[in-house]
Design a protein with these regions (language model features):
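Structural signature of hydrophobic alpha-helical transmembrane segments
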Residues: 43-57, 101-111
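C-terminal ends of transmembrane helices
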Residues: 3-7, 61-73, 116-129
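Helix-adjacent hinge/juxtasegments
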Residues: 65-96
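Small-residue-rich segments of transmembrane alpha-helices in multi-pass membrane proteins
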Residues: 24-29, 81-91, 133-150
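N-terminal membrane topogenic signal
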Residues: 8-23
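Membrane-helix boundary connector in multi-pass membrane proteins
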Residues: 97-108, 117-132
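Membrane-interface helix termini and inter-helical loops of multi-pass transporters
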Residues: 36-46, 154-155
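Hydrophobic alpha-helical transmembrane segments
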Residues: 33-36, 89-99, 151
Length: 155
């Protein structure tokens, strides 16, 4: 059994936290829409922006998970390692661009967000607001990446 302290109380994300989260998530649909439906000359920049933002957000979420784990009296090294690996995986996927087709890169980011979401929802004793925010981030990222993947596959 995991040896962690219990969550302090049930919390829902505040309005300010939702506002910040929505602003931080806005590059996902905006860049995916420009890549999929915008002028052709903007497609490369929009896709690059989407992939870089995916890398930044995956790295950030890994850092959040690391922070949640290090607050524990006895942090578990496996959870800390997974947190670091999420950030490393995001950078490896991004740096593989040019060596692998864009469809694989986009699919890699989709998979990374889904794995991270699954991990977040199986982590015991996190603040109750964290799974809700994690779902919003993963949902926004995955829908946007799926839209970009569809465009990349049909190009």
């Amino acid at each position: 059994m995991d040896d962690v302290r219990p969550a302090s109380r049930a919390e829902s994300p505040s309005v300010a936290l939702w506002a910040i989260a929505l602003l931080a998530l806005s590059p996902f649909p905006l860049t995916a829409l420009v890549f999929s439906y915008g002028p052709a000359h903007m497609h490369p920049s929009a896709l690059t922006s989407l992939l870089i933002w995916s890398t930044a957000v995956l790295s950030f979420l890994g850092g959040v998970r690391w922070g949640l784990e290090t607050r524990e009296p006895r942090p578990r090294w496996m959870r800390q390692a997974f947190s670091a690996l999420c950030a490393v995986a995001a950078w490896v996927i991004l740096l593989a661009r040019g060596s692998a087709p864009d469809t694989w890169i986009i699919g890699g980011f989709l998979a990374a967000f889904l794995v991270q979401w699954l991990f977040d929802h199986h982590t015991p004793n996190t603040p109750s607001r964290y799974p809700v925010l994690s779902t919003a981030v993963a949902g926004s990222a995955c829908v946007s990446l799926a839209l970009a993947l569809e465009k990349a596959m049909s190009a």
